[in-house]
């Protein structure tokens, strides 16, 4: 059992899941090459192998469901290739079934032997899966009514889609004993540290270009007094600098205007006035019109801001070393250009070398991890969350977690 944000999330150990028939919801949604239709990255598929292997080792019959893309998009493809890759990582055959709720799929599920697994076709070929609704409503869909009677347990291991309220994510927990899979368990355990008052000081490193989303996170952290320091970078830092009255120069103001961010200045100013522990860069790496790079102080910027500066890196790194929990989301600079990755990589390095527990989220931030860095799972958590992580940090409810909690309440009679 894991407790997070007043929710009790059941895990596999809370039930006797041995030699049973299990419906496992995973998230193996992967980037697709538009020309060939082949998968470009299989990291999500690889990550789910642990839960599947464990369930098979316990002689369970495992029925796997997942999605890939959305109807009408180039990445809306079959899961047939996924099943082959999944088989490779699990070390056993995961048979692909070209059906979801039809007679063929139901027959395959009924005849599935112990220690065997099948992967059903892309669950989003079922139109109901595209509709978001409350768990009570989703529990009455054809998807749930057709598959639930065929299994004993439901396990959700799809944290990356925990912010969706679709039938495969929230419908089954209301009609079957349900638990979090290993990925879901790790994500929830790591994120619970963020709001655990005993794990302080808490340092947040927030950057990137999704400024409105990041402001929402900061507002929630400030309102609930979660953060001890919020270290800003990227466009988020520029917005706070302007809100503070710092003149970043006409070119940078033009960048903010072109991205429609000037309207957010009053909101950023309100956050500053609330006493939120916001740290703003004291210098920046800028690119001058000539193409020359310069390290300029915040109040004398001579070009377009591309990264945080050297002094800021030193100051931020010292703050990070003090943290008991360090959460990083969003890069400090324009990391698409190798010249402007120093700030992001330096803070990642400081975090990994710090004595604190580190949570790294967001695809851009994760991509900046050096390939040779050894990730100690007891100290560093690399989140697969994406949108789910964003909403969790912003204080929004995650329907999939809410549904697992509801299932526990219904099964145990406890709240």
Swiss-Prot record:
Pfam family, one: PGK
Broad class of enzyme this protein falls into: transferase
Keyword Plastid: no
Top-rank taxon, per record: Archaea
Catalytic activity entry: (2R)-3-phosphoglycerate + ATP = (2R)-3-phospho-glyceroyl phosphate + ADP
Enzyme Commission designation: 2.7.2.3
Any single GO CC term annotated in Swiss-Prot or TrEMBL for this entry: cytosol
Localization per Swiss-Prot or TrEMBL: Cytoplasm
Pathway annotation from the record: Carbohydrate degradation; glycolysis; pyruvate from D-glyceraldehyde 3-phosphate: step 2/5
Chain residues that bind substrate: 27-29, 44, 67-70, 124, 164
Classification via SUPFAM superfamilies: Phosphoglycerate kinase
Residues annotated to bind ATP: 336, 362-365
Disulfide bonds: none
Example of a GO MF term: phosphoglycerate kinase activity
Example GO biological process: glycolytic process
Gene3D superfamilies: Phosphoglycerate kinase, N-terminal domain (3.40.50.1260)
Transmembrane segments: none
Entry keywords, A to Z: ATP-binding, Cytoplasm, Glycolysis, Kinase, Nucleotide-binding, Transferase
Major localization listed first in the record, in broad terms: cytoplasm
PROSITE patterns for the chain: PGLYCERATE_KINASE
Quaternary structure note: Monomer.
Record-stated family: Belongs to the phosphoglycerate kinase family.
Protein name: Phosphoglycerate kinase
Native species: Sulfurisphaera tokodaii (strain DSM 16993 / JCM 10545 / NBRC 100140 / 7) (Sulfolobus tokodaii)
Gene name as annotated: pgk
């Amino acid at each position: 059992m894991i407790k997070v944000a007043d929710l009790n999330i059941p895990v596999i150990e809370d039930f006797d899941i041995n030699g049973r028939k299990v419906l496992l919801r995973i998230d193996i949604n992967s980037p697709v090459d538009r020309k060939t239709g082949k998968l470009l990255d299989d990291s999500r598929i690889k990550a789910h192998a642990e839960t599947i292997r464990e369930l098979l080792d316990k002689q369970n019959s495992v029925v796997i469901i997942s999605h890939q893309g959305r109807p009408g998009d180039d990445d809306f493809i079959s899961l047939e290739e996924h099943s082959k890759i999944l088989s490779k990582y699990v070390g056993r055959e995961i048979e692909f079934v070209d059906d979801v709720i039809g007679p063929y799929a139901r027959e395959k599920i009924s005849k599935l032997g112990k220690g065997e697994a099948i992967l059903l076709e892309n669950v989003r070929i079922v139109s109901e899966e595209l509709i978001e609704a409350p768990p009570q409503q989703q529990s009455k869909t054809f998807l749930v009514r057709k598959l639930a009677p065929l299994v004993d347990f439901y396990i959700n291991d799809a944290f990356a889609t925990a912010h969706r309220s679709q039938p495969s994510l929230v419908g089954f927990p209301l009609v079957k004993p349900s638990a979090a899979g290993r990925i879901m368990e790790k994500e929830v355990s790591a994120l619970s540290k963020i709001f655990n008052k005993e794990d302080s000081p808490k340092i947040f490193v927030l950057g990137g270009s999704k400024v409105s989303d990041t402001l929402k996170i900061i507002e929630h952290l400030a309102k609930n007094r979660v953060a001890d320091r919020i270290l800003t970078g990227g466009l988020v830092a520029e917005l706070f600098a302007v809100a503070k009255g710092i003149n970043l120069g006409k070119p940078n103001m033009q960048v903010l205007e072109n991205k429609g961010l000037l309207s957010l200045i009053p909101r950023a100013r309100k956050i500053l006035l609330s006493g939120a522990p916001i740290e703003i860069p004291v210098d920046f790496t800028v690119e001058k019109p000539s193409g020359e790079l310069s390290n300029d102080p915040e109040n004398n910027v001579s070009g377009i801001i591309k990264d945080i500066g050297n002094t800021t890196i030193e100051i931020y790194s010292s703050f990070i070393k003090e943290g008991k929990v360090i959460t990083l989301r969003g890069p400090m600079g324009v990391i698409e250009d190798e010249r402007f990755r120093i700030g992001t990589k330096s803070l990642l390095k400081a975090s990994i070398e710090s004595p604190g527990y580190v949570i790294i989220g967001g695809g851009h931030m994760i991509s900046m991890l050096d390939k040779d860095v050894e990730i100690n799972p007891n100290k560093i958590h690399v989140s697969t969350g994406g949108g789910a992580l964003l909403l969790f940090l912003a204080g929004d409810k995650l329907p999939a977690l809410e549904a697992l909690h509801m299932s526990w309440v219904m099964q145990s009679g406890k709240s």
